[in-house]
């Protein structure tokens, strides 16, 4: 599956996910102060694997416990702003995090989930990162991606 097909599959994912972030009191509380004194955007890079032929790159513009916007980036598209953190792993590792409902920090410590950028910031806001992961796991697009396709 290439980017164009992923985009069709995603439907209203970006709006729905952003709305769910903004409606989460748990995330809002855990992310209080995020992006206020520093750039708050992050990117999840889910490396192509199995049937998914293009990387899935999700840009999240976050500030002070709120979502300002989310974008599913095309393969060579630059993010609107330089993210402070990029979380990178193959799709099958992201799937494993979701299905095991594991704390992302365990995957970071084992080196299976790589962090590029300001590591200390993400560690300081680890509860917010965990809440964001929980919210992402409930999104229809990601559920379909992780369950309906062979990720290798």
List the predicted regions and their residue ranges.
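Feature captures hydrophobic
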Residues: 1-152
């Amino acid at each position: 599956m290439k980017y164009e097909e992923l985009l069709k599959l995603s439907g209203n994912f970006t709006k729905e996910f952003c709305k769910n972030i903004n409606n989460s009191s748990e995330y809002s509380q855990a992310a209080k102060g995020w992006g206020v004194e520093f750039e708050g955007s992050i990117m999840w890079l889910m490396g192509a694997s199995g049937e998914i032929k293009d990387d899935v790159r999700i840009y999240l513009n976050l500030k002070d416990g709120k979502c300002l916007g989310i974008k599913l980036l095309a393969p060579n598209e630059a993010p609107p702003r330089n993210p402070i953190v990029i979380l990178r792993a193959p799709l099958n590792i992201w799937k494993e995090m979701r299905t095991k409902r594991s704390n992302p920090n365990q995957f970071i410590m084992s080196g299976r989930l790589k962090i590029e950028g300001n590591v200390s910031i993400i560690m300081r806001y680890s509860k917010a990162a965990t809440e964001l992961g929980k919210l992402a796991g409930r999104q229809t697009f990601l559920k379909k991606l992780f369950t309906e396709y062979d990720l290798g």
